[in-house]
């Protein structure tokens, strides 16, 4: 199973409810309103943690909901703001909105933060609604609902070196002998189904991260075999080590393997061919390997460095690691996308259609159905247990043009109007006093 792409649900905490209260102290005549505001709901925040290397943790928990703010209290005491919910993600995580496919964030650096779902503000207490005309209001708001969304987390592996090659050429064996990683190794294709990471340290103290990536086959750029899941991981590697079975155990020609794999990399992303590549001619301890190596070198020439090794016996591995470390010192990180002129700063202005505050549809039972983010939020923040709050909500709907829109749609006195799970009766001659 690939855990490098996972869909999760996040929701910011709701704001705390405002309070309706009045001062009732012995020596304070006409004390007035004293209801405090609710506290802000917590945000859901992604935080990069270098200690994480996979998205495996999200396999077991896919819903993240921040705590809600504390409700307001009497004596004008405001509710406490809720703590943010911190969700740790590995470096290299790309956050994508599941509904719009918009890339929201690319998290690469230790400690980097991204607020993926904001908490709602606290509802106002009745002190906030006092006016000269109404000095003792019995109105308070419920807390604002927190943002909620479905997001896709995609992990593009942050490895310095990627091992590529056909299945069963010895990539996992090589990683296991040069690092403390213990990948699954067996005599069948696609033993490696997920990338394995290992930290390699050379004898002179240099270190780098090496990734044993799932095996490629012809047609991988079109999704054949492990296809796209493999190629997604290699995009950020700085150096490619091409492991080739020089003994031709599977019956394939080593040079043909080399050509096919490089063509797959080129077809998937042209920029992959710009990365420096080293050939690790593996299984040199087996028959026919020396003759195959000689013919291979004749065909590739001097353009590509070739290191004969045997991962099983560790022959030539030391020299290979030194060559990789030397190459990394002179190889910068590669951009994933096309280069732009560094001196030019561009600002992109996007046209965003103004969202209507509400829409009206008809239900199968003839009821008028109100919907829309703005009107639904207004509804959720209204305390319908208090008459003044209900009247205020009705005034707000009238100001938004809901009454006129319902009349245009043919609503008559006594018709049913539905908003979320609640039903109202349309009153054509409503008196707002």
UniProtKB/Swiss-Prot annotation:
UniProt keyword list: Cytoplasm, GTP-binding, Hydrolase, Magnesium, Metal-binding, Nucleotide-binding
Gene Ontology terms for molecular function: GTP binding; GTPase activity; magnesium ion binding
Cofactor(s) required, per the database record: Mg(2+)
Ligand binding (GTP): 165-172, 190-194, 212-215, 282-285, 310-312
Pfam families the record matches: DUF1967, GTP1_OBG, MMR_HSR1
Known EC number: 3.6.5.-
PANTHER family documented for this protein: DEVELOPMENTALLY REGULATED GTP-BINDING PROTEIN-RELATED, MITOCHONDRIAL RIBOSOME-ASSOCIATED GTPASE 2
Function: An essential GTPase which binds GTP, GDP and possibly (p)ppGpp with moderate affinity, with high nucleotide exchange rates and a fairly low GTP hydrolysis rate. Plays a role in control of the cell cycle, stress response, ribosome biogenesis and in those bacteria that undergo differentiation, in morphogenesis control.
Name the UniProt record assigns to this protein: GTPase Obg
Species annotation: Geobacillus thermodenitrificans (strain NG80-2)
The gene coding this protein: obg
